Design a protein with these regions (language model features):
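A structural signal for short, well-ordered beta-strand segments
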Residues: 94-97, 131-133, 201-205
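Residues that flank catalytic or metal-binding motifs in active/ligand-binding sites
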Residues: 55, 65, 93, 127-129, ...
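Conserved double-stranded beta-helix
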Residues: 154-180, 184-186, 190-246
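Catalytic core of non-heme Fe(II) oxygenases with the double-stranded beta-helix
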Residues: 104-172, 210-220
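A conserved hydrophobic position in a structured secondary element of the catalytic/binding core
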Residues: 64, 73-74, 148, 181, ...
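Non-heme Fe(II)-dependent double-stranded beta-helix
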Residues: 1-13, 19-117
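Short, solvent-exposed loop/turn segments at secondary-structure junctions
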Residues: 23-24, 99-100, 138-140, 152-153, ...
Length: 246
């Protein structure tokens, strides 16, 4: 479901913005559910916060926290991009809410787990990829994702903390968009200088030979498994043997 131009964008630049991929109604429902979950975890003291002053928050294991997330992570165009990068038997590594609260600082550029721990030169083919779901408009002011185009081909270098790269850009777009990011590209969230939270989802995928960030087989309830589609079961790792023909 990717055209040749979209494939070339991923190959050459390491990212692809799919504007307004998600309907307005679904985007609103995802945002409301995400903020409800974030608030509930704060109230119970179980929230996962990071950055200075706990100004950013993740909510993990979304597949087990509402049917709307089960459906979202199977979005066909997004999955087509992941399968193009990681193979037809790719696996869901984690699915999280990511909230940047007002005042959240620039997170700095990085490459995704587990790439920074690999010996160099790192593999020239993608091992992991992320989908960044814009549940708000992503703007220059509220923490839009920054990246250095083409940096996924720098197989030995890593981004240096505090360095401003002349080719770094912020990827802005309307709510309902999904940004596909090769995990090897230098990327990170920027500062939220507004008075409102910037809400997104992170659907992180890996090749089937890699260990996912989350142990879905232990974390996902029997109820979710019982209604899961074949696609969702495969993404969660229930199809444990990789497709040798992929």
């Amino acid at each position: 479901m990717l055209n040749e131009s979209e494939k070339e964008q991923l190959d050459q630049h390491g990212f692809l913005l799919l504007e307004r991929l998600i309907s307005s109604d679904t985007t609103l429902q995802l945002r409301e559910r995400s903020l409800t979950l974030a608030a509930a975890e704060q109230e119970t003291g179980a929230s996962h916060t990071y950055l200075a002053n706990d100004s950013a928050q993740r909510v993990w294991n979304l597949v087990d926290k509402g049917e709307i997330f089960e459906e979202a992570i199977q979005q066909p165009k997004m999955l087509a991009a992941m399968e193009y990068l990681l193979g037809a038997d790719c696996t869901l590594s984690s699915f999280t809410v990511n909230v940047l609260y007002p005042g959240a600082p620039d997170a700095g550029l990085h490459i995704d787990y587990p790439l920074s721990g690999l010996p160099t030169p790192r593999p020239s083919f993608p091992l992991v990829a992320n989908s960044v779901w814009f549940l708000d408009d992503f703007t220059l002011e509220n923490g839009a994702t920054s990246c250095v185009p083409g940096s996924h081909r720098r197989l030995e270098a890593l981004p240096e903390s505090g360095v401003e790269y002349t080719d770094e850009l912020q990827i802005c777009g309307p709510r309902g968009s999904v940004l596909i990011v090769n995990g090897a590209i230098w990327h990170g969230s920027s500062e939220n200088r507004t008075n409102e939270p910037r809400v997104g989802l992170l659907g992180f995928f890996c090749r089937s030979m890699l260990k996912p960030q989350q142990a879905h087989l232990k974390l996902v309830s029997d109820e979710v498994v019982s209604r899961a589609t074949p696609t969702l079961k495969r993404l969660l790792g229930f199809d444990s043997l990789p497709n040798m023909n992929a």
